[in-house]
Amino acid sequence: GILDSLKNLAKNAGQILLNKASCKLSGQC
Protein backbone atom coordinates (compact mmCIF):
# COMPACT_ATOMS: atom_id res chain seq x y z
CA GLY A 1 0.00 0.00 0.00
CA ILE A 2 0.86 3.69 0.10
CA LEU A 3 2.31 3.46 3.62
CA ASP A 4 4.63 0.65 2.58
CA SER A 5 5.77 2.66 -0.43
CA LEU A 6 6.51 5.67 1.77
CA LYS A 7 8.40 3.48 4.24
CA ASN A 8 10.52 2.08 1.42
CA LEU A 9 11.23 5.56 0.06
CA ALA A 10 12.27 6.78 3.50
CA LYS A 11 14.49 3.74 4.00
CA ASN A 12 16.15 4.24 0.60
CA ALA A 13 16.71 7.95 1.25
CA GLY A 14 18.16 7.13 4.66
CA GLN A 15 20.60 4.65 3.14
CA ILE A 16 21.74 7.21 0.54
CA LEU A 17 22.28 9.85 3.23
CA LEU A 18 24.20 7.37 5.38
CA ASN A 19 26.38 6.41 2.42
CA LYS A 20 27.14 10.05 1.60
CA ALA A 21 27.92 10.87 5.23
CA SER A 22 30.18 7.86 5.69
CA CYS A 23 32.10 8.51 2.48
CA LYS A 24 32.68 12.12 3.52
CA LEU A 25 33.84 11.01 6.97
CA SER A 26 36.22 8.46 5.48
CA GLY A 27 37.35 10.88 2.74
CA GLN A 28 36.57 8.38 -0.01
CA CYS A 29 34.04 10.42 -2.01
From Swiss-Prot:
Protein name: Brevinin-2Ed
GO term, biological process aspect, one: defense response to bacterium
Role description: Shows antibacterial activity against representative Gram-negative and Gram-positive bacterial species, and hemolytic activity.
Leader sequence residues: none
Keyword Disulfide bond on entry: yes
Protein source organism: Pelophylax lessonae
Key words of the record: Amphibian defense peptide, Antibiotic, Antimicrobial, Cytolysis, Disulfide bond, Hemolysis, Secreted
Protein location: Secreted
Tissue and organ expression note: Expressed by the skin glands.
Family statement: Belongs to the frog skin active peptide (FSAP) family. Brevinin subfamily.
GO cellular component, one term: extracellular region
Disulfide partners: C23-C29
